[in-house]
Amino acid sequence: MAILTREQFRSIAENKSGTRGLKGFVNENRTFSKSTAKTSIFLSHSHFDKDVVEQAKIFFENLGINIYVDWADQTMPEKTDGVTAQKIKNQIISINDKFVLLATNHAVVSKWCNWEVGIADPFKLPHKKFVIFPLADNSGSWKGNEYLQIYPRIEKNNRYAGGEGYYVWYPDGTWDTIEEWLNK
């Protein structure tokens, strides 16, 4: 198992985007409808990681998944307030099927990301609809080790059935391919 670095993830997204490139991908009006996407994901992330959010959108959309990113939602208030919190809570609990924390070093210390994890935990975790996607700094350091002990996580692996790919690892030691998890 391997936690990807930001640079490795950028390279993966760049390969998946082809000639399209990585910039502006979140703000473009190219989304999957609920009827055509396998599932939809609320992507919890730090706003300091907009570059990685672009890459995550490419990564998941190449799997046929619709991604919700709060700052790309035109219905959100300009300044965060109670309406913002209520809209995010509704997106996590009612509208999106799954929850993914893009767990960069910025995200694991973000008050908003930790609040979103607290909202998603009781609604998504019992149904295996909650994962973290840890991304280490390019030096390989990652601050969220306690998350690995209690939450399922996405990692790259090449040692199990199906060969190299992305797997969801559960705290009890079991795993699914990312495709299996997305189809649950």
Residue locations for each model-derived region?
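C-terminal interaction surface of TIR/SEFIR-family domains
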Residues: 1-33, 137-184
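Short, contiguous, helix-prone interaction/anchoring segments in small proteins
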Residues: 29-69
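Conserved BB-loop
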Residues: 64-89
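Short beta-alpha junction loops
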Residues: 73-75, 105-106, 132-141
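An anion/phosphate-binding loop that grips the pyrophosphate of nucleotide cofactors and donors
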Residues: 95-96
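Hydrophobic beta-strand scaffold positions of dinucleotide-using enzymes
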Residues: 100-102
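Conserved TIR/SEFIR loop-to-helix hotspot centered on a Trp-containing motif
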Residues: 105-123
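A short helix->loop->beta-strand "cap" motif at the edges of active sites that frequently abuts
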Residues: 124-130
